Amino acid sequence: MSGGGSSSGPRSKDRNLNGRSAQYDEVPADPRHPETNLETLHDRDLALSADPLPPPPLPLHPPFGAEFYPSDSEEPVTTLELRPVRRFIPDSWKNIFKGKKENPWENPMTEINYTSGGVPCSPPRSPSLPASEPHGKNLAGDSKTVASSYRDPYGGSGGSYNSRREEEAMLPHDPYGSLGRQTQTVKTYSERVEEYNMRYAYMKSWAGLLRILCIVELLLGAAVFACVTAYIHKDNEWYNMFGYSQPYGYTASMQGGYYYSGPKTPFVLVVAGLAWIVTIILLVLGMSMYYRTILLDSTWWPLTEFGINISLFILYMAGAIVYVNDTNRGGLCYYQLFNTPVNASFCRVEGGQTAAIIFLFVSMLMYFISAMVSLKLWRHESARKRREFLGQEMNPNQISPPKVMREVALGNGHMIDVPDQQRDMRKVEMKPELLSGYIPAGHIPKPIVMPDYVAKYQAIKAEDERERYKAVFNDQFAEYKELHAEVQAVMKKFSELDAVMQKLPRNPENQHEYERIAKVLQEYQKKKNEPTFLEKKERCEYLKNKLSHIKQRIQEYDKVMDWNDGYN
């Protein structure tokens, strides 16, 4: 009893010590151990505790090659190498600018925190280890099995609670982790060309031409600003020599009523800068969806753009005239009294000034062209809106009010979409256009579309006519019932197929799947637009309207006859 008590004391103590690492109870034992029999088990020392061994710390070297099992001749790791290295720029920031990820095993040893908290006591000997062998023998062989047999299901290693970062630093990333991700299908060349055409198709229109002209105007405006600014030092020389007064006392009468007070280069720079800012605003606005969807549908914006371009044209024309006048100093360079060797530098026209004059007049011409294109855009949009209005007037039945859906709670946590009750949108019937005077050239009268049964089955005037209408109604009603049942069956089948088509994947995983789904959808659309089915559907709708018209005529006649009988 005493022996049992003495042996149970250390065992309970070990259990209490291992109680802090209870999450390692699912670690499997080492499957690789030498074959033993009953006699060898009797000769071995049993462990002091029945608890499973804690997993050892992760290896210091990569698990491949001869370097995984270091030799005993290597120098031990010093305490300085165990300190964490703190860098001014983290390695995660450096990896952003690298195209290829570095191998974690290539990092220096000091960057890997390979220490482990371990357990406060030394582990007991394994039952598979012979008692005759020393405890430190075959350490290298044991490290092979131990390092590869224990795996922590909780994310740690060696009894350490914060060893997840050690595992991330030591083990490389899973090379097969990307196989589970959804692969993106590569677009074909034709699909990319179609997408490009859809995105930039508006550049072929008059609005796109305006955007191209804006880009050219920005380049010319920048050239004007640069060329004019390059020779602004001549203005300082002029004001330093003559000030703000007329040189040599020339009066207005001698100049023919003209007075030149000095260079007007600031005015030219202000004109170029203002035009550049307005042009870049027009360019950015024209590239937006707001311009294409809202502004082009308005009646005032094309005319506003025309006014802006005309204003900039006038400003550039004024700036060009002022700058040309500055090059000959208001006509003073044509007088011999002023054009002396001392003042020759003021009358000399440099190459940059000539380029500035050319750019000024070309920019003026570009803004005039933009104004004309704006007028053309205004006429084009007006014609487009008129065509759309005429198309809506010719086909009023094809326009249906939008169906507004709203969510309704069922009470069990589910929501369904039901059509919201809306006010009936009454159709506004357009009155026929009345033309007074002569018929304008190119006028096409609008045809009046009327079903044939309206003119054929007019108001009933006699009893035999009523019987004839009734016979036609009974004869074609059977055909209508048969067609209606057939069309309704097909429409029900189509509604079921629509629900199935909605469940098809929108983003297939590969190109083969994408082509297969596209082929199925194409065949389905072909079935829905089959001429035979569409003809039956049209015939059913026609018979429905015709029979309703005949029935209305019969009811009107019966009402009149009942009224006459009651009166008599």
From Swiss-Prot:
GO terms for cellular component: bicellular tight junction; plasma membrane; tight junction. Its main location: membrane. Residues 233-266, 325-354 are extracellular. It is a multi-pass membrane protein. Residues 205-379 form the MARVEL domain. Residues 462-559 form a coiled coil. Keywords: Cell junction, Cell membrane, Coiled coil, Membrane, Tight junction, Transmembrane, Transmembrane helix. It holds the Pfam family Occludin_ELL. Residues 1-72, 116-163 are annotated as: Disordered. Residues 1-211, 288-303, 376-568 are cytoplasmic. InterPro entries: ELL/occludin, Marvel, Occludin_ELL. It is found in: Cell membrane; Cell junction, Tight junction. Residues 29-46 have a biased composition (Basic and acidic residues). Residues 451-562 form the OCEL domain. Residues 52-62 have a biased composition (Pro residues). The chain crosses the membrane at residues 212-232, 267-287, 304-324, 355-375. Belongs to the ELL/occludin family. May play a role in the formation of the epithelial barrier. PANTHER family: MARVEL DOMAIN-CONTAINING PROTEIN 2 (PTHR23288:SF3), OCCLUDIN AND RNA POLYMERASE II ELONGATION FACTOR ELL (PTHR23288). This is MARVEL domain-containing protein 2. It comes from Xenopus tropicalis. The lineage of its organism: Eukaryota, Metazoa, Chordata, Craniata, Vertebrata.
